[in-house]
UniProtKB/Swiss-Prot annotation:
The chain crosses the membrane at residues 303-323. Belongs to the syntaxin family. Expressed at low levels in roots, stems, flowers and leaves. Disruption phenotype: Gametophytic lethal in homozygote plants. Slightly shorter roots. The double mutant syp41 syp42 have short roots. The double mutant syp42 syp43 exhibits severe pleiotropic defects, including short roots, a large number of lateral roots, semi dwarfism and early senescence; these phenotypes are associated with defective secretory and vacuolar transport pathways. It is found in: Golgi apparatus, trans-Golgi network membrane. Contributes to the regulation of secretory and vacuolar transport pathways in the post-Golgi network, and to the maintenance of the Golgi apparatus and trans-Golgi network (TGN) morphologies. Vesicle trafficking protein that functions in the secretory pathway and mediates liposome fusion. Required for extracellular resistance responses to a fungal pathogen. Also involved in the protection of chloroplasts from salicylic acid-dependent biotic stress. The keyword Protein transport applies. CDD domains: SNARE_syntaxin16. Interacts with VTI12 and SYP61 to form a t-SNARE complex and with VPS45. PANTHER family: SYNTAXIN (PTHR19957), SYNTAXIN-42 (PTHR19957:SF397). It comes from Arabidopsis thaliana (Mouse-ear cress). The gene is SYP42. This is Syntaxin-42. GO terms for molecular function: SNAP receptor activity. Residues 227-289 form the t-SNARE coiled-coil homology domain.
Length: 323
């Protein structure tokens, strides 16, 4: 059963209620005269199809007509949490699918239809979770205020990368499973062909012809079971091919977001390089300005005046000494 952790939301509401002053007295006449503490239900109320009723509390202070609002997280946060939860479920089911693949590929003498049905069911559930997460991911960029668009896009790209990695891993597992199924089918066909060459067995003979060739009832049943297993393998191969095609479409949709993320990273690198070039150019201009300031006319005039002042001081000293 799917569960969601609401401990953080509960603690937020509890702390907000504690911050309000406790009512000193409450009567029937003034029970609705105090401020209204509005518990604004955001995405949490949408997920549980319920809303909070206003809580009335009496405040004897001067701000008896004030009201404050306790905000909930935006709707897109719930979408991201649901996608994260689906990603974890996909990882768990992929582990179960790997075990089911191992059981289905083991040679058995009995009926293994239950294992094949389990593989089919797990593959269908994983594909549905990936499709559902992909739709939620596409809605993520359109929900919420425009001020949070950059944050939503970063979360969207991060989740898209995780979904694409899971899709690639599932596709790789399905391809490996399909290859081993085909190898088993080819091995069985080679055995049937060998029997045909030796004149001992024919897959296309009718039951009467088999009896005429000297096969007893037990051998005829075994032959029919082998044909049934071969048809079952063929059906599984077609099913795996279908799931691989579905995964290819999902990966195609997710690749746009991942490519967008790579484009932004390249753009950041380009901007960093431009900033580095601009800083170097600015440093050169600063050095040039410093040299210009040192070699300017004002500096030359000040130097000449200083030299003249020194000369005049020397002449004044000599005048006093000589005369």
């Amino acid at each position: 059963m799917a569960t969601r952790n609401r401990t953080t939301v509960y603690r937020k509401h509890r702390d907000a209620c504690k911050s309000a002053r406790a009512p000193l007295s409450l009567s029937a006449s003034d029970s609705f005269g105090g401020p209204v503490i509005e518990m604004v239900s955001g995405s949490f109320s949408r997920s549980n199809h319920s809303s909070y009723a206003p809580l009335n509390s009496y405040d004897p202070g001067p701000s008896s007509s004030d009201a404050f609002t306790i905000g909930m997280p935006p709707a897109w946060v719930d979408d991201s949490e649901e996608i994260t939860f689906n990603i974890q479920k996909v990882r768990d089911k992929m582990n179960e699918l790997a075990k089911a693949h191992s059981k289905a590929l083991m040679p058995t003498f009995g009926d293994n239809k239950g294992i094949h049905r389990e593989v089919e069911m797990l593959t269908h559930e994983i594909t549905d979770l990936l499709r559902k997460s992909e739709k939620r991911l596409q809605m993520l960029s359109t929900r919420g205020p425009s001020e949070e668009s950059n944050l939503r896009k970063n979360v969207q790209r991060s989740l898209a990368t995780d979904l694409q990695n899971l899709s690639m891993e599932l596709r790789r597992k399905q391809s490996t499973y399909l290859k081993r199924l085909q190898q088993q089918k080819e091995g069985q066909d080679e055995v049937d062909l060998e029997f045909n060459v030796n004149g001992k067995m024919s897959r296309l003979d009718e039951e009467d012809e088999l009896g005429g060739m000297g096969f007893d009832e037990h051998q005829t049943i075994k032959l029919k079971e082998g044909q049934h297993v071969s048809a079952e393998r063929e059906r599984e191969i077609q099913q795996v091919l279908g799931s691989v095609n579905d995964l290819a479409q999902i990966m195609k949709d997710l690749s746009a977001l991942v490519i967008d993320q790579g484009t932004i990273v390249d753009r950041i690198d380009y901007n960093v390089q431009n900033v580095s070039t601009s800083v170097e150019e600015g440093y050169k201009q600063l050095q040039k300005a410093e040299r210009t300031q040192r070699e300017g006319a004002m500096v030359k005039c000040a130097t000449i005046l200083l030299v003249l002042c020194l000369i005049m001081i020397v002449l004044l000293i000599l005048k006093n000494i000589l005369f």
